[in-house]
């Protein structure tokens, strides 16, 4: 529990370097573990979720050395994993669970997979369904949740799968199984989801074709270890972008942020709301990077629809906070996915911001945010609950910057899932 005070009249100023991208850090570990030879990961995100992925591979016999934000992996190829001596603990990481269900679905030994209380309530059936069609043998609870077992399996077969809902995790699970499957695997997306898996597969020497929403690949003979320099996470940068926009007299630059076009929904949405964000591209061979500079500006309400969600799903809580300060209403629709995150993020965003006086209506697939609301703590301080959700915790901390009165935040340790040093970095730009 910590007490947070409003920003000073001076506002927020300076440069921020947020940690490495969580999605890319996960995938770099996975590809490094199944590739042949050494993989080096720099600007690695050593957060709780990603460290669970690392521990899983160590328990599968992969030699991994970590020195702060640098990692070396000695990969032994697809068949180089060894039976674990205990259940594979995914912690709170849905990314680890869903992607590894695909990647580990063709091993010659059984694996038990477990997670914490929150993860054990999140649905896994939508991943299991296409993997089962490919020949994977996965057992879950009657509710389609963890704990589960990935059974020993000698053969996978390629399938054509039409994604019913945009999901990078489901798509990636299919592709990670597909690189080990006989025949052709084809994933059809109506709305593009983040493409880090496809980009990284190519970097490690894999081959696939992606055209007009159709991703096609065949069994890969062997991947080769690589150097992966992880960009700063745009999902973490989003909190500082919004903080500068809504905190008076502020100007911040966030350094070396990954601006992958399947992840830059936050930039497009804030721009539509009236933000002017300076994007200074950085030459790079891997994922596109840029420095982002933003100043305090007046925002206006917009409609955020299903087509916007895949490239900004993790940023919707902080977008909701920005919308409370905008002129007019912001309507978020097609965001049912928020119901099955670490918390029901639709309900949790509304419950926490409403404690500060925000006027938000709940919809089955989103929310209606009535803008122009001053945030106020009754009786000089209000208690906000992180609810075990890292993105809710950081949203609450940014809300405290513009709240009249103090915020007492509980569960702030949840931030370590994606951004262990968030409060320290926020304090630096408040000086």
Curated annotation (Swiss-Prot):
Broad class of the protein's primary localization: cytoplasm
Q: Where does phosphoenolpyruvate bind?
A: 22, 94, 122, 169, 345, 391
Entries under InterPro entries matching the protein: Enolpyruvate_Tfrase_dom, Enolpyruvate_Tfrase_sf, EPSP_synthase, EPSP_synthase_CS, RNA3'P_cycl/enolpyr_Trfase_a/b
What processes in GO biological process is this protein linked to?
amino acid biosynthetic process; aromatic amino acid family biosynthetic process; chorismate biosynthetic process
Report whether Cytoplasm shows up as a keyword of the record. Answer: yes
Question: Which reaction does this enzyme catalyse, per its entry?
Answer: 3-phosphoshikimate + phosphoenolpyruvate = 5-O-(1-carboxyvinyl)-3-phosphoshikimate + phosphate
User: Where, by residue number, does 3-phosphoshikimate bind?
Assistant: 22-23, 27, 167, 169, 314, 341
Q: Which GO terms describe its cellular component?
A: cytoplasm
The subcellular localization recorded is: Cytoplasm
Give the record's pathway.
Answer: Metabolic intermediate biosynthesis; chorismate biosynthesis; chorismate from D-erythrose 4-phosphate and phosphoenolpyruvate: step 6/7
- UniProt entry tagged with the keyword Zinc: no
Spell out the molecular function terms from Gene Ontology: 3-phosphoshikimate 1-carboxyvinyltransferase activity
EC number, UniProt record: 2.5.1.19
Keyword annotations from UniProtKB, A to Z? Amino-acid biosynthesis, Aromatic amino acid biosynthesis, Cytoplasm, Transferase
Active site per database record: 314
* Pfam family for this entry, one: EPSP_synthase
Query: What family does the entry list?
Result: Belongs to the EPSP synthase family.
Per UniProt, subunit arrangement is: Monomer.
Q: What does this protein do?
A: Catalyzes the transfer of the enolpyruvyl moiety of phosphoenolpyruvate (PEP) to the 5-hydroxyl of shikimate-3-phosphate (S3P) to produce enolpyruvyl shikimate-3-phosphate and inorganic phosphate.
Which NCBIfam families does the protein's record reference?
A: aroA
- Name listed for the protein in its UniProt record: 3-phosphoshikimate 1-carboxyvinyltransferase
Q: Lineage of the native species?
A: Bacteria, Bacillati, Bacillota, Bacilli, Lactobacillales
UniProt lists the gene as aroA
